[in-house]
């Protein structure tokens, strides 16, 4: 187990610098430097299984860590942490490993090891003219962390990142290595499961329970993703009438309003997001409206996400100022709204990878999301605005993002 390195008790801090604590043991997991991809993957699986077996035998706690986007100190209660960001193998399975009932192109399948970052997977796919089906607001999460914690997606009619998953390789203990997929849509066959030394389980309920499970089912070692041909997203980021925003946030009836996107008249957006300043809620909100277009033969990366057009460090920016000037939340956000919110964009086109890209967060920032039914959106927003008005200011901005309901049992996006 030279690939598993025990660093002993260590201070651990999350990416947003909002949580810090002492772990009982910081464990660094890595793959072998020699051998085929499959050999490396299986050797690491054996290491992880042995590590879990020892932990269970000694009745200790252990949990994997991905991109350090955790927001809770629960992980530090006498718990060992496995850092997985070196576990980045990925490959496309062969046709012989695919279930014969799977009629789609097997080249639209990607098997990714748990520590692979969304960004690296997107680059890998981009080089093959492929794309993830959806993304969160940025790309710093590991694939296992993103799905098991229910990271939101970006597509109105698709869903979250975890909704593109068609199989999970979960290690529970020594000699307990499973590949779980839906019985109603089995994508891989016994040959694939055997190649990663796993027992194949076809079970819809088990799959939906394990998909968003915060690691409670075991160590998610590998994730089978269904991807698609790359596509462009045409971006309109503009202020829209408050009355139109109120209609859309409860109905998504785009034909009932007049959006500033004349070239896309009659088309349903791929993505719709509203940005609201809670200290000036009667102002026309900023809307980010994206339309899906076929991918090009050749692609030249635009400057769409440069600081000049979209301030990717908005949360960190707010945090730095308000930390140094307590009580300045309302004043700062109102004065600097034009710098905090994205600038107007008109018909700029980019791949999914370049549209939802890097986010740099500095300072002790906190971001959270709650899932609500579509028809309760305006009511929920009104409650949040009243809370801020009644109980003091919070250095925050609100973003409303609309995604399809997920079948994952613990997904926060469980409402229609």
Predicted regions and their residues:
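Noncatalytic alpha-helical scaffold of FAD-dependent oxidoreductases
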Residues: 1-416
């Amino acid at each position: 187990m030279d690939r598993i390195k025990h660093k002993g008790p260590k201070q651990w801090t999350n990416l947003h610098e909002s949580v810090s604590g002492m772990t009982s043991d910081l464990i660094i997991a890595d793959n072998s430097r020699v051998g085929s991809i499959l050999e490396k993957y299986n050797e690491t699986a054996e290491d992880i299984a042995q590590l879990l077996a020892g932990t269970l035998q000694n009745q200790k706690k252990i949990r994997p860590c991905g991109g350090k986007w955790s927001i809770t100190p629960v992980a530090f209660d006498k718990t060992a942490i496995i850092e997985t960001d070196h576990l980045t193998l990925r490959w496309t399975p062969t046709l012989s490993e695919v279930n014969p009932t799977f009629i789609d192109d097997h080249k639209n399948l990607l098997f990714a090891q748990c520590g692979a970052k969304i960004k690296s997977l997107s680059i890998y796919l981009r080089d093959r003219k492929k794309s993830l089906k959806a993304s969160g607001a940025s790309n710093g999460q590991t694939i296992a962390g993103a799905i098991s914690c229910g990271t939101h997606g970006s597509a109105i009619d698709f869903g979250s990142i975890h909704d593109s998953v068609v199989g999970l390789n979960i290690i529970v203990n020594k000699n307990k290595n499973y590949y779980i997929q839906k019985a109603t849509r089995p994508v891989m066959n016994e040959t694939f499961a055997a190649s990663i030394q796993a027992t194949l389980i076809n079970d819809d309920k088990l799959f939906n329970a394990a998909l968003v499970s915060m690691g409670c089912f075991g160590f998610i070692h590998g994730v089978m993703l269904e991807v698609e041909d790359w596509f462009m997203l045409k971006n309109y980021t503009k202020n829209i009438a408050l009355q139109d925003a109120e209609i859309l946030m409860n109905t998504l009836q785009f034909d009932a309003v007049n959006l500033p996107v004349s070239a896309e008249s009659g088309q349903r957006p791929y993505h719709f997001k509203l940005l609201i300043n809670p200290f000036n809620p009667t102002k026309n909100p900023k809307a980010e409206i994206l339309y899906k277009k076929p991918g090009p033969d050749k692609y030249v990366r635009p400057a769409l996400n440069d600081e000049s057009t979209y301030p990717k460090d908005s949360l960190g920016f707010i945090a730095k100022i308000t930390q140094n000037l307590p009580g300045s939340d309302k004043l700062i956000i109102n004065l600097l709204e034009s710098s905090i919110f994205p600038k107007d964009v008109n018909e700029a086109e980019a791949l999914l990878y370049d549209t939802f890209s890097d986010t740099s967060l500095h300072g002790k920032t906190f971001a959270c999301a709650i899932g609500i039914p579509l028809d309760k959106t305006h009511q929920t927003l009104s409650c949040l605005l009243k809370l801020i008005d009644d109980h003091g200011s919070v250095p925050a901005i609100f973003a409303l993002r609309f995604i399809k309901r997920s079948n994952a049992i613990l997904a926060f996006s469980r409402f229609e």
